[in-house]
Amino acid sequence: MGVKKKKEMQVAALTICHQDLETLKSFADVEGKNLASLLLHCVQLTDGVSQIHYIKQIVPLLEKADKNGMCDPTIQSCLDILAGIYLSLSLKNPLKKVLASSLNSLPDFFLPEAMHRFTSRLQEELNTTDLYSYRKVTDNISSCMENFNLGRASVNNLLKNVLHFLQKSLIEILEENRKCAGNHIIQTQLMNDLLVGIRVSMMLVQKVQDFQGNLWKTSDSPIWQNMCGLLSIFTKVLSDDDLLQTVQSTSGLAIILFIKTMFHPSEKIPHLISSVLLRSVDCTSVPEWFMSSCRSLCCGDISQSAVLFLCQGTLAMLDWQNGSMGRSGEALLLDTAHVLFTLSSQIKEPTLEMFLSRILASWTNSAIQVLESSSPSLTDSLNGNSSIVGRLLEYVYTHWEHPLDALRHQTKIMFKNLLQMHRLTVEGADFVPDPFFVELTESLLRLEWHIKGKYTCLGCLVECIGVEHILAIDKTIPSQILEVMGDQSLVPYASDLLETMFRNHKSHLKSQTAESSWIDQWHETWVSPLLFILCEGNLDQKSYVIDYYLPKLLSYSPESLQYMVKILQTSIDAKTGQEQSFPSLGSCNSRGALGALMACLRIARAHGHLQSATDTWENLVSDARIKQGLIHQHCQVRIDTLGLLCESNRSTEIVSMEEMQWIQFFITYNLNSQSPGVRQQICSLLKKLFCRIQESSQVLYKLEQSKSKREPENELTKQHPSVSLQQYKNFMSSICNSLFEALFPGSSYSTRFSALTILGSIAEVFHVPEGRIYTVYQLSHDIDVGRFQTLMECFTSTFEDVKILAFDLLMKLSKTAVHFQDSGKLQGLFQAALELSTSTKPYDCVTASYLLNFLIWQDALPSSLSAYLTQQVACDNGDRPAAVVERNTLMVIKCLMENLEEEVSQAENSLLQAAAAFPMYGRVHCITGALQKLSLNSLQLVSEWRPVVEKLLLMSYRLSTVVSPVIQSSSPEGLIPMDTDSESASRLQMILNEIQPRDTNDYFNQAKILKEHDSFDMKDLNASVVNIDTSTEIKGKEVKTCDVTAQMVLVCCWRSMKEVALLLGMLCQLLPMQPVPESSDGLLTVEQVKEIGDYFKQHLLQSRHRGAFELAYTGFVKLTEVLNRCPNVSLQKLPEQWLWSVLEEIKCSDPSSKLCATRRSAGIPFYIQALLASEPKKGRMDLLKITMKELISLAGPTDDIQSTVPQVHALNILRALFRDTRLGENIIPYVADGAKAAILGFTSPVWAVRNSSTLLFSALITRIFGVKRAKDEHSKTNRMTGREFFSRFPELYPFLLKQLETVANTVDSDMGEPNRHPSMFLLLLVLERLYASPMDGTSSALSMGPFVPFIMRCGHSPVYHSREMAARALVPFVMIDHIPNTIRTLLSTLPSCTDQCFRQNHIHGTLLQVFHLLQAYSDSKHGTNSDFQHELTDITVCTKAKLWLAKRQNPCLVTRAVYIDILFLLTCCLNRSAKDNQPVLESLGFWEEVRGIISGSELITGFPWAFKVPGLPQYLQSLTRLAIAAVWAAAAKSGERETNVPISFSQLLESAFPEVRSLTLEALLEKFLAAASGLGEKGVPPLLCNMGEKFLLLAMKENHPECFCKILKILHCMDPGEWLPQTEHCVHLTPKEFLIWTMDIASNERSEIQSVALRLASKVISHHMQTCVENRELIAAELKQWVQLVILSCEDHLPTESRLAVVEVLTSTTPLFLTNPHPILELQDTLALWKCVLTLLQSEEQAVRDAATETVTTAMSQENTCQSTEFAFCQVDASIALALALAVLCDLLQQWDQLAPGLPILLGWLLGESDDLVACVESMHQVEEDYLFEKAEVNFWAETLIFVKYLCKHLFCLLSKSGWRPPSPEMLCHLQRMVSEQCHLLSQFFRELPPAAEFVKTVEFTRLRIQEERTLACLRLLAFLEGKEGEDTLVLSVWDSYAESRQLTLPRTEAAC
């Protein structure tokens, strides 16, 4: 039951000429019942839909006539007119189809006459000679052939004429297209006409019966001659590369169709086409007509695109089914394949690549059709092992990762068809165990999961052979696929594959098993891994699985929901009961089973798998769980729970009372979400709920209105409709109350954004309709003056999103400003807006713009503005609102322009004064904002607008002239031109001359020497600095004294340029253009457009400041887009002219050029980007092609010094173009040339060229390999196979190979200075992103093998980083199975210890390669693999042969370190592979050798040299790692006893080198942490027991911060009971003194050490408290010191790490100090710790807030507090944790019986007693003056008044519940006095604020409002305690309307005192 209004069908009405109209009138009868009358009525209607009704009556009327009627002149004339009507209607008009359908039912006896009339009318059409009317005629021919009998018969009758017309029209269109070259709008239209003409020609051949015979196939037949003429035209079109490729491809189809139709005998057609494709036509054996029509195909050189389109025509137009073409057809099929394979290696243009992929997929379809016709001769040629299938597979593997989605889709079709082809060749045999399928499956599974093609191909395989064979190879595949679903780019592929697999598996299991037991196996395979991910996966994984996979699974198997719910409910119950029965389904750090349950239920309900909401709540999930989900700590759980409530598959499902209550509860705590994505989802889901309420209310309203008096027994509702409707109304009103309350003073951006978005949705969904639809709620009914003011105050937000939302909402409300504001208030708003528009704060002008627009649209402007109008608006009532807005906009713009004109005049005299007092950009911004909201295409006051536009343009140019010298100076960022009052104009002019651009690119020639006359006198400069005098008058306003900074000048100038650019761009985009000066409707003349273009050109090519030219670019883009759509040819060609002009300027630029070659060529790349990006993408992109050709040529290496500057420009422009996503795949053909230019440019001796080449190369890497998606720089997500890379860029294969060979051959040259080969870096950077794929096959054309020896030799580079890169680059080039042999080969090249001459660089490079290869090998293999162990053993033996490199015999520490790293890696690999089989290493004597290395190392003997030996830190770290491994190995062998080890942990810890100590401590810390967390198998290893004393000693003497920090961490992990008693003996400190020492460290050290020390001190404190109960008072002072330390560590300015440490401390000590039933601390200290918790819950850092919620969870889950709230043991969000913490605290105060001393402290929190209001206001003034971009206190999370609200609420509950009252009035006297003083101060400050203070003094106003609310809340509580107020007064919101709250605090009000 839907209530949505259907979209009305728009039908253009038919019309007839005057003569036909008179004819109808003459034949119409008086009664109006004959056909003429019917048609007359029809044509007189203006509504096309009504005309359809009349047309349908034509045939029934004619059926009533007898046969004599065919002689009736009335009917004859009407049939003639109907023919005319049909041919006059446009092709897409529904009337045309209706008329054709009606005439198809015409009685037979009328058909001859009707045919005659239609034929004569069509003949008239065919006789037309107007070129631009040809399209209409062509469309008519087409429509006649489509399901219209009369039309088809008419075309048959006129076939000769039709063909002649088509031939003539195509020839003339081609000629006209040639003449209109350059006018792409006309050319696009002509090419479209050409395309339609070709298609209609094909349609004729396919549908006209005459072509089925042979009568016309004679050379003298007119039809034959026309056919030959058309074929000749198609051939010409096919060869014309200036035409669109769609036109060419259609010509290819037409050529083959015509050949098929015309050629005789048909048996020879395949041979003829084959010879054309292979370019082997025997001209002597083909018919003369074919030669004359297709000579270029027979004798000429056919382009690649022409051959491609002919292949397409061959496959599409010939009949491949049933083997009708015989053997010659099969031969043609194979020849076509070979031609396509040849083309695939040649074609690189993206559009042609796309065509090729489609045609190859089409070829596989044709091959299947031929095989299905039982063609035995093709079986060998097309089976899986054939060369053709091999080539197709190569194509698939090469292109399955292609960036174009459509091309990847074609590879899927190809692969699917290949499998089908192979099945057809082995039909009859059991194809599943077929070697082809087995090998294909295994090779696909060997691939990594980051390859998209793997998913699609596996999906095809599953459909072909069944999933059971794949699961038999690896049953963990479902889990593996789910694991990768955290990567958004892979998610759609992974979910599609999973769906294919589980569907196939279910079908297979059902067919195999009769019983229902199969479902358990299916659940185990597909549902269990899903549940694990939902509970334990990372956030992205869960989100994507929920969005993509879960709906598919539940849609296919709804019965699985019960299984999932049962498992998850059991898991939640186990967790709540503290029984970890199901540890795999949820840990404390994950969303857990509750989140998984909500996700499943949400999806199930949204897709209709739950019967009703009632079933859900009653049977599947409890109320408590819903509430837990709504405030869960993890945002996705909250979203899923909300989704469960809001989403339903039935749009009219009633929203239950429970759902409404839960939604209200959710909104209370979730508006302040910090994630934009979460906010968007919340708002979207609530909008769905509102739509449900609106639509279900329609149903309820209809039920209520029904006349039946009995109670409705409808499944929709269980109560009377009126009750439900009232509930809806109350609910919506309550929601709006909550949302408006959320817009309180100081509310965060997130809260405001959410509240305003939801209110906007309410206004949209429950809009007041025109007419009769019932609306259950209207937002405007709940709007009063306070709320209207609240919305307006949202304009003051520093976030524009909030301004936009508030403005849009105000526009949606039916009540306007005039309803709520008096004229004085509106005048004040207007003045405030004008003041803000000239503020020096950039964000103020945005507020001004929204205020002005608000006043314009609300018609609330001051009456004084009407003086700006010279012409009043004349309008009827219908247009009145638009006319009023236009009038208001015009007045405001004129007012702003008048002000701006004065300010520009002032700025021309004193730019400094302008920057300090009236930066002009604000005015321009407001003008732009006002124009943007106005519909500029339908203006009424055109005569007034014209001079305004003209003046606006001149003003923009003037303003730009004033500020441009700063923007175009050499150093705009630091420039500050000074002027004096006396000589302002001349002084400024002199300075502006000085700051003209000086970076004239002469640094390309020589260093610039500062000449004597360039020097300046500092005294003279200082003398010229004069403060702006306060008495200076500007437009009658006083200007305050202000120090002008360089920043202020620059901001004024570049923002002015920005606003001018945006204004000009917008004017071009939105204003109607005047094609000729006399035009009455246009506002912008052609000359003005050209001026704007010249303006942009000048500033883009000359500006130096990025902000200026980037925004000039934005405006220029709008201009170029308009020009390219402009019908005026002179304007249309402007971008092309500008492009040629700037390219010539670049080519001719030299060091003296004005074009800026620094700053990445400044605005030049932007200029060219704008010109190219606006070129129509559907065209030939000629501008791009020519530009790229020029730039590539300029970017190449050059020896001419004069060409250096053009080269730099070209490189910078190329970088910008390759980064421009709008150019898409059109830029790809130039990537290879760009890469060559970048790599060669990197070898230039000129720094600027090298720098630009580097930037270009970086852009190319991103363009080729995609935006970096993984944190790991070397992750395969941003890599591609060598085959794919070199197939896409084949030119780079020989280039990179040659460059690499050149580098490798000279890298270790013996001649003099080592050659550092700068290009090696870029070469290796490319190569390391390639990898060999198992699917690459054995093709040697683009093999990666030749690169390997050169990369190995690059490892000999003298540059350390290059050697590392070579090692990384080598790894992907070596197949995994070849790695062991390669490692052995590399090891064999290392020198022996007896060799006399060797180079350490060579050794180092080789060892790095060994190390990286070994690492890759170990990562890719499973440890249990026997081959793996065998290979590692062989490698170990080879490694031992060169062991001298790890010993002192090798003098180089760098190579020693790498060799030791290899040894360490081998120990890790062999330990992993052997597990308990330790003798593998022992049998090789490996550990013995390692012990020898360590014993002989400097760790034992000491270091004979100074610390500054190269490679020392690296060597120490490597050696230490190996030593630690040896110690653990020895301990494992000897039963944890430290025997037979060359070195002990104690020795390592006593090393003089921090690198050694740090690594050792790291290893020990890891063991202690594992033991502390319970992850260790046996706790702390015995080797580490009793080391407390050692760590204490180390702590006292360690001076290295990192090591000291780790020692403290270890002590923290250890039980204090083990080491604390030893402090006095070891370090001569009592435990108490040790505690003081620890706290001193926590007070003074840097953050990380401070955090660890705080944790340690807290652990020591806890130990004292728990073990020394009787002597607690002995450390009372230390306890107080600790409390203060905790308090100080909570401050916002401290690092996050410090505050996280405090949270951890508070959480661990909660049972002891915060919730102890018998408090240990004094109440003041206990409450101070609680205040810390509350402060941390309001932190702006989410990590801190989330951690603090753990403290609250711990606090409310204690035995004495778990009844305080309903959320004990639950993970909650910080927003509700604040309220829960206060609830627990208030409960504890009552438990402790500490209300009397505790209440004043809590009331102090409420009032904010620490704030000094006077100082606060004074500091605000200081902030405003000093900081240009200071946005005051931008709070993203913390909201003071939310804390006040919760505290007030819980204090009231506490006081009400306990009934406590102060025993004496004096008890609260201090607070009452403070509150009274605060009231008076607030009143005073409010009086001092100016009018409209909320806009012009937002910061002060907001702070005062916040303090006012706090004071008000405190007043109410004090009144309640005194018995002056009842409960009903107190429960009012602490932020009632502004007016009410002001009354409570003003001095004249008694309540305020």
Curated annotation (Swiss-Prot):
GO terms for molecular function: enzyme regulator activity. Residues 886-918 form a coiled coil. Pfam families: DUF2428, TPR_Trm732, TPR_Trm732_C. Keywords: Chromosomal rearrangement, Coiled coil, Phosphoprotein, tRNA processing. Disulfide bonds: none annotated. The modification Phosphoserine is found at residues 1015, 1024, 1161. One of its GO terms (cellular component) is cytoplasmic side of endoplasmic reticulum membrane. One of its GO terms (biological process) is adaptive thermogenesis. The keyword Phosphoprotein applies. Expressed in pancreas, adrenal medulla, thyroid, adrenal cortex, testis, thymus, small intestine and stomach. Together with methyltransferase FTSJ1, methylates the 2'-O-ribose of nucleotides at position 32 of the anticodon loop of substrate tRNAs. PANTHER family: THADA/DEATH RECEPTOR INTERACTING PROTEIN, THYROID ADENOMA-ASSOCIATED PROTEIN. Belongs to the THADA family. It is linked to Chromosomal aberrations involving THADA have been observed in benign thyroid adenomas. Translocation t(2;3)(p21;p25) and translocation t(2;7)(p21;p15); the sequences derived from chromosomes 3p25 and 7p15 do not appear to include a coding region and the fusion events probably result in truncated THADA proteins. This is tRNA (32-2'-O)-methyltransferase regulator THADA. The gene is THADA.
